[in-house]
């Protein structure tokens, strides 16, 4: 590899990874509540270990949901259905400890919340402040069709394929836990040119040989997913490199909601504000503003205004308008970043209630995002992945640049 070339690595995990089990449980509970009470306030945290699920947090709602049933259904759907996995949907204990949202926090967010989003006036949108301070990033680049960095895109596809071959009995000896990692080589112009390294760790039945696992994963998981032109004789494969992965899931490691924030976003390729997504209703800007920032960045790149774009939004608790909007195109912008910020302000309502209205976020759409990434998804329809504002942004930005 020449000195000007570089390597970049991102990882993903399967839905059976302990931390991802927690994310899916938290978002399944959120979806069940939003389905009956779209204005509910939810901050739901989950912890799992051998034979135990603990659900805690702050939930303020007018409805009732059966949390233990939702937990068991989610665990069963993931595939933990046998006691010998060390974690089983039917026999695990489920403990809950739920409080209401602090009135001190609610005070800054509550006003006008009873209004339906479709009928909210600008004054009502202005009255709903951010649920917390914080900074959020959104990113897009033209490395893949879905405008995501290639390392995380391929890592997610491999992780999804691992679950698919398990659930469809193509590789029936696989168990739910698993991880993937992809290293991409970039040329001197920053373009991805080849896959340098692939790492796959897949939980399995104890009687299967490592030779069979390695052969099967290469043929049934890697080859169907990774474009052949990116693989060459120098690509390195590490498949279950410890030699054995029988004990996994919550029996192997305890899990917590919100511990896979880099897997959830851009695989480390872009910056992260630190806030997790799962279990949080859309008044939490940790989630909704990160989605809005991706929406902005993706439309800028889709418009051809930059090859790569990172958007930062920042908020103060109880204040509706973002305290700052920052855009970095890493030298790839076709117009200045000041112009981009101006057209973004003109075309995106980045107040919390404005984001909720713009992206229609008071719906039960979150559990499907809780594994395999919140961004760049081609298998599900997510509002922040639309590029419906690209043409308008391009027209306005080029008009400003000509002035």
From Swiss-Prot:
* Record-listed ATP binding positions: 17, 177-179, 244-245, 253, 259-260, 276, 280
Pathway(s) the chain acts in? Amino-acid biosynthesis; S-adenosyl-L-methionine biosynthesis; S-adenosyl-L-methionine from L-methionine: step 1/1
Q: How is the cofactor bound?
A: Binds 2 divalent ions per subunit.
Is Transferase there in the keyword field? yes
Q: Please name the PROSITE patterns in this protein's record.
A: ADOMET_SYNTHASE_1 (PS00376), ADOMET_SYNTHASE_2 (PS00377)
Specify which residues bind L-methionine according to the UniProt entry for this protein: 58, 101, 253, 284
Under the subunit heading, UniProt states: Homotetramer; dimer of dimers.
Family the UniProt entry places it in: Belongs to the AdoMet synthase family.
Q: What is this protein called?
A: S-adenosylmethionine synthase
Per the UniProt record, the source organism is Geobacillus kaustophilus (strain HTA426)
Q: Which gene is transcribed and translated to give this protein? A: metK
